[in-house]
């Protein structure tokens, strides 16, 4: 081979390598974004389901409703540590609701006494608190960013 052919071969090889590598990085970026979206959704959904269950004292009716929800889990995304964190958060939230309920006895109409699970859950969502917790937890996974 002449030096001209070697240069052409090296140039073409580098071009192909760089083209394939860039495409792979782009696909990785898309996969990471998709995984992040799925992870955050699963974290928030799990928190919501657990808060409803615990907030309504593991009511059979609530569990039946949650069991019929078509948005079930297809594969395990969250780790055991994630579930432990969610259970801890839900436990704390339930304690807050119980304390609030106890403090409201005699101060609100009879029908308004008790835990306000849906009010509490809506206020958590509106504050974006669970979003920020899920994002912080996602960052601890160490998923590499390609930007």
Per-region residue spans from a language model:
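Post-signal peptide N-terminal segment of mature Sec-exported envelope proteins
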Residues: 30-49
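Bacterial signal peptide processing site
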Residues: 23-26
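Bacterial N-terminal signal peptides that target proteins for export
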Residues: 2-10
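Compact alpha-helical subdomains of small soluble proteins
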Residues: 65-147
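Soluble non-cytosolic domains of exported or imported proteins
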Residues: 39-43, 56-59, 80, 111-115
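C-terminal motif of bacterial Sec signal peptides marking the signal peptidase cleavage site
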Residues: 18-21
């Amino acid at each position: 081979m002449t030096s001209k052919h070697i240069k052409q071969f090296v140039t073409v090889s580098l071009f192909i390598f760089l083209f394939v590598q860039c495409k792979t990085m782009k696909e990785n970026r898309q996969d990471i974004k998709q995984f992040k979206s799925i992870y955050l959704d699963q974290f928030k959904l799990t928190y919501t389901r657990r808060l409803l269950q615990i907030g309504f004292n593991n009511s059979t009716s609530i569990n039946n409703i949650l069991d019929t929800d078509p948005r079930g889990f297809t594969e395990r995304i969250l780790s055991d540590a994630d579930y432990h964190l969610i259970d801890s958060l839900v436990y704390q939230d339930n304690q807050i609701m119980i304390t609030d309920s106890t403090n409201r006895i005699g101060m609100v109409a009879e029908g308004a006494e008790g835990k306000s699970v849906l009010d509490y859950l809506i206020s958590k969502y509106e504050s974006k608190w669970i979003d920020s917790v899920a994002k912080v937890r996602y960052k601890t996974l160490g998923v590499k960013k390609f930007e």
